[in-house]
Amino acid sequence: MTETAYGNAQDLLVELTADIVAAYVSNHVVPVTELPGLISDVHTALSGTSAPASVAVNVEKQKPAVSVRKSVQDDHIVCLECGGSFKSLKRHLTTHHSMTPEEYREKWDLPVDYPMVAPAYAEARSRLAKEMGLGQRRKANR
């Protein structure tokens, strides 16, 4: 490591130490006498870490739980991540896989119009909305 790179690394280490200690002290009660020890401990811990060596890792693409063709059934949709069956996939993706529908479609190379709701469920909700009169203009009150 060159001297300037080493100096920059040391500056970064001191800056990170200061940020971590400041964040800790702002949320915890620390006696003034223990502050130097805390700073030293954090600095030592950070000094012990190093940048990971670049290792060529052969990462296999994750395989879907079921085939994309079989994932959409009339009464349910199968999650390609875990294999679970759902009427609506959006909430499951958000809560269990921390993914948006767009990220899910991108990960599995799905078309933009890939459904997030089972076809029968969508039809039932549509029918219910029409029966309730949703989507129609209100009658003028005179």
UniProtKB/Swiss-Prot annotation:
InterPro entries (alphabetical): ROS/MUCR_sf, ROS_MUCR
GO biological process: regulation of DNA-templated transcription
Gene Ontology molecular function: DNA binding; zinc ion binding
Pfam families xref list: ROS_MUCR
Signal peptide: none
Keywords associated with the record: DNA-binding, Metal-binding, Repressor, Transcription, Transcription regulation, Zinc, Zinc-finger
Residues in C2H3-type zinc fingers: 79-97
Biological function: Specifically represses the virC and virD operons in the virulence region of the Ti plasmid.
Family: Belongs to the ros/MucR family.
Protein name per the record: Transcriptional regulatory protein ros
Species annotation: Rhizobium radiobacter (Agrobacterium tumefaciens)
